Amino acid sequence: MAFELCHTISVARLEKHKNLFLNYRNLNHFPLELLKDEGLQYLERLYMKRNSLTTLPENLAQKLPNLVELYLHSNNIVFVPEAIGSLVKLQSLDLSNNALEILCPDIGRLKSLRHLRLTNNRLKFLPPEIGKLKELQTLDLSTNHLVSLPEKLYQCQSLQYLTVDRNLLCSIPRQLCQLASLNELSMAGNRLASLPLDLGRSRELQYVYVDNNVQLKGLPSYLYNKVIGCSGCGSPVPLTENKLLSFTSGQLSIHVPAEVKSIGSATDFVLPLQELALRSLHAIFCSFLQDLSCTTPISLPKSLLELLQCPLGHCHRCSQSMFTIVYPKLFPLRETPMAGLHQGRTAVSFVAYCCSTQCLQTFDLLS
């Protein structure tokens, strides 16, 4: 086996191969033949599926500087060294079916990375540096132990496909609604009890899957007429305690995101002073940003600045920005034309989040 491996690598070096297949070789360490002398300067794609690797060499980028694809599916890799960030041409990295518990911040240095697959590992969190992957199009994080997603993920403005099925997520950051290129979002099999108010507002987002989030009972009305998967949602009894606000309509009780401070009703004709102040400040803030001649830096508390940059949501009737209070209106899925598509497999409702009693009274999902 060792002779055959050395021969394969030697031929690849001599003939300047661009692709090298070392799958199913029972390797428990990275082959030294790949790293000796100048390495394989011409190699672009390296496939090492179903081996027993536990880590990667520190000088990988130095010896294989032109790698565009690194396929390490089904190994025993526990950590990835910081040197991974030096693979400046890498476009595709697959570390699925390994034993990763931590993803090093240097992953954010892979400026050319388009596809990152980390399915079936032991990740509990992601470094915020992942937001630096400006070219990233596909991110698959299925079957990990993630309890949250970094807000900075919204900076991956090329991201088209995000999959976080079978994790431990109780919520997702509202900032993800700013992913302008996102076409498909899959969050099945988590612990979601609510979704961001603006989810589905982007026209680019066409496919959303939230199946088997048993406590999830409300879908933002922006998702109506999208392709949605919501089987197994809407448990009739709460399975775990949570501190989310909820509102009741008939026999239905729907949780709202944790950022919502209060819930208005059809009889609340006067907006809270804090909400009015934030809406006025937001208008000034937007005008300030549009004034190209203004060079004065904005000096505001971090939490306030983040809220102005990414409001709680936008009214589903008139698009007014909302910051503390929402006026919700329920449309049970079973009472819409979409009921036939789901055939009783879900008990969710569409929720229109409005900015005032006027919008609440005039919003109609089916018109």
Curated annotation (Swiss-Prot):
Keyword presence, Repeat: yes
Disulfide bridge positions per record: none
One Pfam family per UniProt: LRR_14
Gene3D superfamilies, sorted: Ribonuclease Inhibitor
SMART domains linked to this entry: LRR_BAC (SM00364), LRR_TYP (SM00369)
Keyword Repeat: yes
UniProt keyword annotations, A-Z: Leucine-rich repeat, Repeat
Alphabetical list of PROSITE patterns matching this protein: LRR (PS51450)
Residues in LRR repeats: 16-36, 42-63, 66-87, 89-111, 112-133, 135-156, 158-179, 181-202, 204-226
Name of the featured protein: Leucine-rich repeat-containing protein 28
